[in-house]
Amino acid sequence: MATVSFTQMKHGTRQDYAMLQALEHSFYTKTAQRLHDELERQGQDSIDGYLISRLEHGLQSATRAWRDGANDDWVVAALLHDIGDGLAPQNHDRMAAEIIRPFVSEEVTWVIEH
């Protein structure tokens, strides 16, 4: 596998960054799969004491939003609003907002963040 020629970003060449851009594009196209994988983890690794897993909670929230006629942005936000809970339980709201920010409206992002 090709690698960059630098150890500090400021020393990168045009060729380094062209190669990285192509590799990053490939990585970005797998975002949905990584989110799916994290949702599956939420079904397996949830906080004790609750009647349902974090995955079930997200699915219930998204289903309720969809049944209420919410647009896709709100349904996605309802599904993913706790996506950061496993890594950042004290500030998972901000983490979730940053994850969905490129894909949904600013209003939806703001609600998830706050």
Explain the meaning of each model-derived region.
Residues 1-114:
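Metal-dependent phosphohydrolase cores
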